[in-house]
Amino acid sequence: MKTRQNVYELKDDTLSWYSRAVEEMKSRDINDPTSWWYQGAIHGYATYPSALTYWHDATGYPPSQQTVNSGFWNRCQHGTWYFLPWHRMYLFYFEEIVAKAIRDMGGPADWTLPYWNYCEAYNTSASPSNQQQALQIPPEFGSSQGPNADFASLWIKNRRNYVLNKNNVNPWPAMNEAEFTNSGGDISFGGGVTGFAHSGGQTGQLESLPHNVVHTDINGAMGNPDTAALDPIFWLHHANIDRLWQVWLAQAGRSNPVVNAWKDFRFKFHDANGQPVEIAVKDVETTQLLGYVYTPAFPLSSTTPARRSVPAMDVVGATSASFSVGDHMAPLDLTMVPQPARGARLLAARGGDEKRTILRISNVKGKGATSPIDLFITNRDNEEGNEENFVGCIGLFGLENASTPSVESDGSGLNFAIDISDTINKLRQRDDWDEDNIRVQLIPQSKQDSDVEINVGRVSLHSEID
């Protein structure tokens, strides 16, 4: 059984060999399934200008049309219950290809892909220095000043941030969900029920946070599905997401879907020798089935009871028109459904359990390299976003693809669902609490580039039916 290790606990030359393998794989032709470029294109490939910034560096560029149309490129699964198993398969075959390249260069026979556990920033048992270190892209991957000379191939141009925002790596909204999926498109750990979905609309909580938000925080190639896998840190990021799935599954009351529509779905890749292979979701339901485990790391399990399944809910209020997101937006008033006409209230639940309240951000369209967006909710006039009314953050990973009608997408944009029950419960303690006076605020974490456009179709607030 192989063991994938925490990158900050490595005591060997794992990253040195990784850098050498990346260099070797970059030297291979883009039409070679074992090349760095082909492996990146499995996740996503495009020829619009911002993507070509990275793709025109590929050996042998442009690829043949036969390669582009082979059915192996642009296969990443997003906004779907296949997100986690597809990326586990993707990492497995990538790791095999890298390990073979390392062996062929005379390296160790047991090389494994490390993981970057940025979630350690939430480990209250860790030292402040270790919490802060966890947020930093490992120094072997270079800095904003350029590559680390000893690991030059682990750097890529245009990364926006080398230190993540702590809010962007919070594992608990996902880890505290009890259900992997549900058929109603409501909040779940692993995503909603779909078919093949290169750009789906049923995003699970783990995909939403930390996955999407880390992508857009680092930005550059990582901020776009059509270039993300060209950044060497992509693979360590996804190893951590893969690890979190395994940690979640080991907790009481959690399980993967049992229906054949999930278990029997198959995807195509290439093995270490560049030969086509097919694998089913049921073959990757645990890491042990693929012959590897992760070293124990935070979080080892949830610290709170699993959230109850999302019950029947009703709209409490919503914005009355679409709106654009700028660098600093004033809070937006929600138009509240008159109390006699709605079946839900923002009141404490009867019988002990707290009511679940969900904030939905729907039909988000746009373009450009967006930064993560912080979300706030308040009941006070002129109250700006602050820690007390912070409810979460979203990353618009795949925004342009989701906004463009195509075979893979209906062009309706991205959708998000955030459980804001805890914040609503806190606000309810205020003397001036008024459930018919609710405002939301969306604030980008950094100044957006001039070519960024973000339009939100609707923000709506949903609560349990009384």
Swiss-Prot record:
Top EC class for this record: oxidoreductase
Gene3D superfamilies membership: Di-copper center containing domain from catechol oxidase
E.C. numbers: 1.14.18.1
Free-text cofactor note: Binds 2 copper ions per subunit.
Cofactor: Cu(2+)
Domain free text: The latent-HcTyr1 form contains a C-terminal lid-domain (LID), which is hampering substrate accessibility to the active site.
Residues at which Cu cation B binds: 211, 215, 238
Biological function: Copper-containing oxidase that catalyzes the conversion of L-tyrosine to L-dopa and then to L-dopaquinone. Can use various phenols such as p-coumaric acid, phenol, pyrocatechol, syringol or pyrogallol. Accepts several of the constituents of lignin and potentially participates in lignin functionalization.
One annotated GO molecular function: catechol oxidase activity
Disulfide topology: none
Keywords assigned: Copper, Metal-binding, Oxidoreductase
Chain ranges passing through the membrane: none
Assembly and interaction partners: Monomer. Formation of a dimer is observed when the protein is in its holo-form.
Regulation acting on activity, per entry: Cleavage of the lid-domain increases activity levels, affinity for substrate and turnover rate. Exhibits high saline tolerance.
Family affiliation: Belongs to the tyrosinase family.
This protein's record includes keyword Glycoprotein: no
pH dependence: Optimum pH is between 6 and 8. Exhibits a relatively broad pH range of activities (over 50% of activity between pH 4.5 and 9.5).
Signal peptide bounds: none
Name this polypeptide is given: Tyrosinase HcTyr1
Catalytic reaction list: L-tyrosine + O2 = L-dopaquinone + H2O; 2 L-tyrosine + O2 = 2 L-dopa; 2 L-dopa + O2 = 2 L-dopaquinone + 2 H2O
Summary of temperature dependence: Optimum temperature is approximately 40 degrees Celsius. Maintains 60-50% of activity between 40 and 65 degrees Celsius and retains 30% of activity at 72 degrees Celsius.
Binding site for Cu cation A: 43, 78, 87
Modification after translation (UniProt): In vitro, the C-terminal lid-domain is slowly cleaved off in an autoprocessive time dependent manner, leading to the formation of cleaved-HcTyr1. The processing rate is not influenced by factors such as pH and added metal ions.
Pfam families hit by this protein: DUF7868 (PF25271), PPO1_DWL (PF12142), Tyrosinase (PF00264)
